[in-house]
């Protein structure tokens, strides 16, 4: 009886699960960052999404970054899954803050609320917005 080798995706998933299996500390150490993670689903029209995102949304957020108290922003586009398929997610924005208190203060600002309200103008596939704590 021959056994088939696990797929690359299964191996990557196992490696990630092993590497990430440590629970996050209850009390964050000094300097541990917090973030708002915005996960964008596939939009109905990617060209329209990209145009609005680059020309309107990102500049809108950037114009309020100081008010919001952002320390770092990373924008990621997902062209494919690891096995070459079209992913359910299209983009991700990782918006970092120096502490949980700074995050809570930032998301309460008029600038953050304006950027959040702007999502309806281009994120036609829907979004998921999460709060995350950096654990490494």
For the regions a language model picked out, list residue spans one by one:
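Macromolecular interaction modules
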Residues: 4-7, 20-136
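Sec-dependent N-terminal signal peptides
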Residues: 7-14
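C-terminal motif of bacterial Sec signal peptides marking the signal peptidase cleavage site
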Residues: 15-19
């Amino acid at each position: 009886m021959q056994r088939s080798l696990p797929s690359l995706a299964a191996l990557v998933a196992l490696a990630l699960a092993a590497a990430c299996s440590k629970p996050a500390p209850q009390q964050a150490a000094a300097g541990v960052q917090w973030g708002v993670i915005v996960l964008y689903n596939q939009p109905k029209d990617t060209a329209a999404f990209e145009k609005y995102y680059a020309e309107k949304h990102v500049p809108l957020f950037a114009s309020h970054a100081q008010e919001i108290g952002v320390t770092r922003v990373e924008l990621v586009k997902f062209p494919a899954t690891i096995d070459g398929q079209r992913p359910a997610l299209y983009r991700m924005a990782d918006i970092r803050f120096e502490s949980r208190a700074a995050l809570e203060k930032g998301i309460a600002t008029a600038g953050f609320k304006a950027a959040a309200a702007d999502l309806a103008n281009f994120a036609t596939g829907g979004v998921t917005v999460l709060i995350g704590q950096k654990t490494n």
